[in-house]
């Protein structure tokens, strides 16, 4: 959302912007706010240790309710497929505000995979006034759900807006370890995994695959910014700890992580955002999931689904690291996710008067 916030702030004659954050993924949130110099007007700070999805839902709704009652916004915007995005749409509906869904229309077709994100998307679609799908495929998904053409704005993905801005900037790391990693001339396998459906044995298999890949290629270093979740670390530690060419590092702020993506040779991830970012940087992506709501990258040839099967992950990584033609075919494929102007299209659409009728 950062590019959208900044674009709206550049149009004070049209928009009085207030920014609310839930505090979900606190460390990552603070990093992005700092990188884009955004100061929230409201911080719900909803997260407590060990809370359930139901508690996240109710705490988010309780936090947003008085804000919307006091501010009486014309529009509420939220991005993505989190529970808090669905709650923002529901709160906007309760308060008679129009809701704009950024990154709308992503689908896997299975309401429980990913859980709860797919259902969050479906419910948010029903509540939204205006839909901003990032790709033609996601726009088609909305139309298949009965959403009218007049409330669909094909925007591109704001993730790419943010990525291209950061990637173009020079960066001098202050962390000696990060500086060492970025200066290492060897090929880098960048690994990120955190998704709920991969916790436990599936994530353990990913770890085994990473170790086998590194053992097979003496010129490859694996860099793993591992998630703070103890379940993630418990699953990965047996395979990834104590290897001289596997670097387990703390979660990175947004800007240094983009620099790691730029430095990498190959990326193995279960992250939706990384699936979108990597193709714009010319980096092949192996997707450690059984399904993806971002099939555009698969169709374009920038990404390949490998699931969490150790043998398949190793085989595909080996192919790309051994075959220059196979690697080049993925690295040169055109990114389907946007051109860096999504925020402008979203702001333009919001300037047009619209009714509050749900579609």
Map each language-model feature to its residues.
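C-terminal amphipathic helix plus adjacent low-complexity
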Residues: 322-359
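Membrane-proximal helix-turn-helix segments that form the acceptor-binding/catalytic region
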Residues: 117-130
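A donor-sugar binding/catalytic signature common to diverse glycosyltransferases
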Residues: 78-79, 101, 131, 257-298
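A nucleotide-sugar donor-handling region in carbohydrate enzymes
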Residues: 20-27, 127-201, 205, 306, ...
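Donor-nucleotide binding loops and adjacent catalytic segments primarily
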Residues: 13-14, 25, 30-32, 51, ...
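A short, histidine- and acid-enriched strand-loop-helix "catalytic/donor-clamping" loop
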Residues: 101-115, 129
């Amino acid at each position: 959302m950062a590019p959208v916030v900044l674009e709206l702030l550049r149009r004070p004659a049209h928009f009085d912007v207030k920014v609310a954050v839930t505090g979900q993924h606190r460390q990552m949130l603070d990093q992005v706010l700092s990188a884009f110099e955004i100061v929230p007007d409201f911080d719900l700070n909803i997260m407590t240790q060990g809370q359930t999805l139901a508690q996240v839902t109710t705490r988010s709704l309780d936090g947003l309710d008085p804000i919307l009652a006091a501010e009486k916004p014309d529009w509420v915007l939220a991005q993505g497929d989190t529970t808090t995005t669905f709650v923002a749409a529901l709160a906007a509906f309760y308060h008679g505000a129009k809701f704009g869904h950024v990154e709308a229309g992503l689908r896997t077709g299975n309401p429980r995979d990913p859980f709860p994100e797919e259902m969050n998307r479906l419910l948010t679609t029903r509540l939204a006034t205006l839909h901003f799908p990032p790709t033609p495929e996601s726009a088609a998904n909305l139309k298949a759900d009965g959403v009218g053409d007049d409330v669909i704005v094909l925007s591109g993905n704001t993730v790419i807006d943010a990525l291209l801005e950061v990637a173009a900037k020079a960066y001098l790391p202050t962390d000696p370890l990060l500086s060492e990693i970025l200066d290492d001339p060897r090929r880098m396998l960048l690994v990120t995994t955190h998704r709920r459906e991969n916790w436990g044995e599936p994530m353990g298999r990913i770890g085994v695959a990473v170790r086998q890949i590194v053992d097979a290629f003496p010129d490859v270093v694996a860099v793993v910014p591992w998630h703070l979740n103890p379940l993630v670390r418990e699953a990965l530690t047996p395979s990834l700890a104590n290897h001289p060419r596997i670097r387990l590092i703390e979660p990175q702020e947004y800007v240094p992580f983009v620099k790691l993506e730029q430095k990498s040779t190959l990326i193995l991830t279960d992250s939706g955002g990384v699936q979108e970012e990597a193709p714009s940087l010319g980096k092949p992506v192996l997707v450690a999931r059984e399904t993806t709501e971002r099939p555009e990258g698969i169709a374009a040839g920038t990404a390949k689904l490998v699931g969490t099967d150790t043998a398949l992950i190793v085989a595909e990584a080996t192919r790309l690291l051994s075959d220059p033609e196979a690697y080049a075919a993925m690295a040169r494929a055109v990114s389907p996710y946007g051109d860096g102007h999504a925020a402008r299209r979203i702001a333009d659409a919001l300037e047009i008067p619209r009714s509050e009728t749900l579609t």
